[in-house]
């Protein structure tokens, strides 16, 4: 179509023809300035929104914020389980979505564009949970606020206890725990009415924890531990006031609330709990589980697809068992190798928990000499190694807690040793690579040191976090840490656990498997004794979908590495690949894939 000129356009053309040269140059310059101003405005609006979003998250759930290293709200517990607070939080999220979509993404700098995409993903994911009443299930054997705060009492966890302010902050939380318990009881009563209750099996496992928290007198309470460990540097007045405060709070507020909770669980809640196993037995349970799967894997994989991936991985790893078994002196069928290993006394060499910790410390020292060849980007924050507090040992597994961003707490690898004579040695190398370095510590401590918005510095997703840690285990082979067949078996056995999780999690929550089916499958495939298979199964019952992120995330990172190696050939650098993966903190897997693909294209 032939263009036409209006009178207005002709007049403009005439004016431009007669204008001085400087005026012609001023127009583009003015346009650029306006565009730059708009871009700056978008950047300011985005940064303001990102800060508000994270602060809202931290205030809504201050305990989780503290676990992630943000100690600003260590005197608060939040009341995220209160229905009105939950509704208000979802309303906030909806407002944030509107504000986010009003910002021009293309006007942002590349790193802000990534943050924009992550925030968009997080908000959409959070809002998918709105129809499902998670607040009606505030307690399980795996986690609850009373047990978390009890674990903080020694000052070694995510709640520091070194200053008067710290002691007051923890006491403040104890004062708020009674109302939280009463809200939890009210929620669970509502859950009973609506058919949203926990499986009876996991609550029977949880009950002893809560009975144990009820003390005969304040001084016997685990929550009184800080008052028994007041630093000598505190003034006499502060010591007296703090001790009196802890004693009064426990006697008049906390202990009665804990007694109410234990009695409610035993006499009212557990009798009303369901005998079914999976999440799909709940109202809207299958839809609820699908949202959990998407959240935990950051993918659109369906349960059946994940189930089949798990079965395929189980078969692959059993093929490796067949190869490594004879090197360990085992000549039976491959599937029986884990059971045989458990029966060998030589793989249970410990007499004390300190001996276990000493092996990890030796391994940590060894890694300090090997990791620089694989990583140029490493955290500055140190990693400490500690034994798990006694209260939580029965239900805890070895794990990592992040450092405090203010430097008051290092990253910590916690070793859970219930009975040192039964602590197996074959899995120690791969476990430490996962929970310590270069697994969780390299990822999470480094993320806190990067120049990122707080919602990324302290946030994340399960598929990347656990996927990276499981991928980190595979690096043991390149560092020569699996040269002994028993150590390589330990790595394979941990891989097998993550593959089995894909099978049993989807089996129980999407395919109608019973608790007993899962226990039997784990015993046959992993060689676990009944007690361990039961506790693992009950973990997946309490945390539907959580165990899926490990293998799904790890497989994606390995896929991306193989893609980069094939595309770049001699130009491929493993330290650079690790920098690309870790260099912007946690990403949903789709965004990680785009980032690696860009690096491949730029590096060719």
Question: What spans do the regions from the language model cover?
Answer:
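Gram-negative bacterial Sec-dependent N-terminal signal peptides
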Residues: 1-21
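N-terminal maturation segment of proteins
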Residues: 24-604
């Amino acid at each position: 179509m032939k263009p036409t000129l209006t009178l207005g356009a002709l007049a403009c053309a005439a004016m431009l023809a007669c204008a001085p040269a400087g005026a012609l140059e001023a127009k583009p310059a003015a346009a650029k300035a306006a565009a730059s101003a708009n871009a700056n405005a978008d950047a300011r609006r985005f940064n303001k929104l990102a800060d508000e979003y994270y602060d809202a998250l931290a205030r809504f759930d201050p305990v989780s914020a503290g676990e992630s290293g943000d100690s600003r709200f260590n005197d608060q517990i939040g009341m995220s389980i209160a229905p009105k607070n939950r509704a208000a939080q979802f309303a906030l999220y909806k407002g944030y979505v509107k504000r986010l979509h009003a910002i021009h993404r293309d006007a942002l700098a590349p790193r802000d564009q990534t943050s924009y995409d992550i925030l968009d993903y997080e908000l959409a994911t959070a809002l998918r949970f709105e129809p499902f009443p998670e607040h009606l299930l505030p307690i399980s054997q795996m986690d609850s606020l009373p047990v978390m705060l009890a674990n903080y009492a020694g000052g070694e966890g995510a709640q520091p206890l070194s200053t008067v302010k710290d002691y007051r902050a923890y006491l403040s939380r104890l004062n708020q725990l009674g109302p939280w318990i009463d809200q939890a009881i009210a929620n669970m009563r509502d859950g009973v009415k609506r058919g949203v209750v926990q499986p009876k099996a996991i609550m029977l496992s949880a009950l002893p924890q809560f009975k144990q928290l009820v003390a005969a007198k304040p001084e016997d309470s685990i929550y009184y531990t800080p008052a028994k460990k007041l630093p000598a540097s505190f003034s006499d007045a502060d010591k007296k006031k703090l001790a009196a405060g802890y004693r009064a709070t426990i006697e008049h507020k906390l202990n009665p609330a804990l007694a109410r909770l234990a009695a409610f669980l035993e006499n009212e809640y557990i009798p009303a709990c369901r005998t079914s196993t999976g999440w799909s037995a709940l109202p809207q349970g299958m839809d609820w589980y699908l949202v959990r799967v998407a959240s935990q894997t950051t993918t659109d994989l369906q349960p059946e697809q994940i189930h089949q991936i798990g079965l395929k991985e189980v078969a692959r790893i059993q093929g490796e068992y067949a190869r490594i078994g004879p090197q360990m002196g085992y000549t039976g069928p491959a599937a029986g190798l884990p059971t045989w290993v458990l029966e060998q006394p030589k793989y249970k060499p410990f007499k004390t928990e300190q001996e276990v910790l000493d092996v990890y410390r030796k391994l940590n020292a060894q890694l300090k000499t090997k990791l620089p060849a694989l990583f140029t980007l490493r955290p500055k924050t140190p990693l400490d190694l500690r034994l798990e507090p006694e209260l939580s040992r029965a239900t805890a597994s070895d794990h990592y807690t992040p450092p405090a961003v203010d430097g008051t707490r290092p990253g910590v690898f916690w070793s859970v040793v219930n009975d040192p004579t039964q602590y197996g040695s074959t899995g120690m190398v791969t476990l430490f690579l996962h929970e310590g370095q270069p697994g969780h510590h390299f990822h999470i401590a480094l993320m806190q040191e990067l120049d990122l918005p707080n919602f990324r510095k302290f946030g994340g997703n399960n598929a990347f976090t656990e996927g990276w840690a499981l991928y980190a285990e595979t690096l043991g082979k390149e560092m020569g840490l699996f040269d002994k067949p028993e150590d390589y078996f330990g790595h394979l056995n941990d891989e097998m656990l993550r593959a089995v999780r894909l099978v049993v999690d989807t089996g129980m929550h999407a395919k109608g498997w019973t608790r007993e089916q899962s226990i039997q499958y784990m015993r046959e495939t992993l060689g676990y004794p009944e007690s361990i298979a039961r506790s693992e199964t009950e973990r997946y019952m309490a945390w539907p979908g959580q165990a899926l992120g490990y293998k799904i995330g790890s497989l994606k990172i390995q896929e991306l590495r193989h893609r980069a190696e094939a595309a770049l050939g001699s130009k491929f650098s493993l330290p650079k690949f690790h920098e690309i993966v870790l260099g912007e903190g946690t990403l949903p897997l789709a965004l990680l894939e785009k980032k690696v693909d860009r690096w491949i294209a730029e590096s060719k």
